């Protein structure tokens, strides 16, 4: 088995959940097996970066990705003394001077969230926040323009596809200019992870056409049946139920100690 190391880097990295997931991945193609190492991440929240270092295993970089105009529209005031706009060189420095194999971008989603009213989402404050999506793509592309990142993964709330349609059109154009082919879809993290919760996300995947062949596939959904060691245990809280496509569970028949209406796998139900 041939071993290979791949490197990932994160924009708006938060506390590092995405980076931790990359670190756990062990992709295998034929007789080649790879493991991922994190080069770092960028965020504006110091507390989040402390968690990022703990989960990702490497320190992140405290950096504001707003342009000056975006900063003023979001905060309602001029930037403090000493503040400056981030540059492509700042991005390369945050990655330790290395070019990653994949970049994960999870820019703030509040402006496109259904939890925010349409009226509020159109205010200058939240329009500036939404524009970080485009800003991150531009900084990433310019940072490694001479040696493009092979794969870009961009995720956000599903409503970005409607409220942020104009931004996605610009992102598509920008990525095309940098040499990327783009695919957009939505997925449910609950289905992918075999969880009892539905958490839908918008997903954009961009591959550099000169570096990555057209062979990217969607993540397989996990089987929703319990593990062999917990087949008698309840997996779903009383307020939840299995995903609609899951046939491995049946309504609870009142097993002693069972607090969920959905528990044991059906006698004939393999996931």
Feature locations, PLM:
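S-adenosyl-L-methionine-dependent DNA methyltransferase catalytic core
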Residues: 1-38, 49, 174-177, 201-271
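Core alpha/beta nucleotide-donor-binding catalytic domains of modification enzymes
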Residues: 2-148, 158-169
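Generic beta-strand hydrophobic packing signal
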Residues: 39-41, 103, 152, 185, ...
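Residue-level signal for pocket-adjacent positions within structured domains
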Residues: 60, 107, 182, 187, ...
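Active-site donor-binding loop signature of nucleotide-sugar glycosyltransferases
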Residues: 63-65, 189, 220
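Short secondary-structure transition/capping segments
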Residues: 83-92, 100, 187-205, 230-242
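Conserved Class I SAM-dependent methyltransferase catalytic core
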Residues: 129-206
């Amino acid at each position: 088995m041939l071993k290979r190391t791949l490197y990932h880097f994160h924009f708006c990295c938060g506390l590092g959940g995405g980076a931790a997931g990359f670190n756990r991945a062990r992709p295998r193609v034929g007789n080649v097996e790879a493991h991922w190492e994190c080069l770092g991440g960028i965020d504006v929240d110091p507390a989040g970066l402390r968690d990022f270092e703990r989960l990702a295993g490497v320190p992140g970089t405290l950096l504001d990705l707003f342009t000056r105009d975006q900063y003023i529209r979001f905060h309602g005031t001029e930037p403090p003394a000493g503040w400056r706009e981030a540059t492509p060189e700042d991005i390369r420095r945050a990655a330790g001077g290395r070019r990653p194999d994949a970049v994960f971008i999870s820019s703030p989603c509040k402006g496109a969230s259904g939890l925010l009213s349409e009226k509020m989402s159109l205010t200058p404050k939240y329009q500036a926040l939404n524009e970080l999506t485009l800003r991150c793509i531009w900084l990433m592309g310019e940072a490694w323009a001479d040696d493009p990142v092979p794969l870009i993964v961009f995720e956000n709330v599903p409503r970005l596809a409607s409220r942020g349609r104009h931004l996605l059109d610009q992102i598509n154009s920008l990525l095309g200019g940098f040499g990327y082919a783009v695919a957009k879809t939505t997925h449910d993290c609950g289905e992918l992870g075999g969880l009892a919760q539905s958490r839908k996300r918008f997903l954009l995947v961009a591959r550099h056409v000169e570096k990555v062949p057209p062979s990217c596939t969607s993540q397989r959904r996990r089987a929703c049946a319990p593990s062999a060691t917990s087949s008698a245990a309840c997996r779903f809280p009383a307020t939840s139920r299995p995903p609609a496509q899951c046939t491995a569970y049946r309504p609870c028949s009142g097993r002693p100690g069972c607090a969920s209406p959905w528990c044991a796998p059906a006698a004939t139900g393999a996931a």
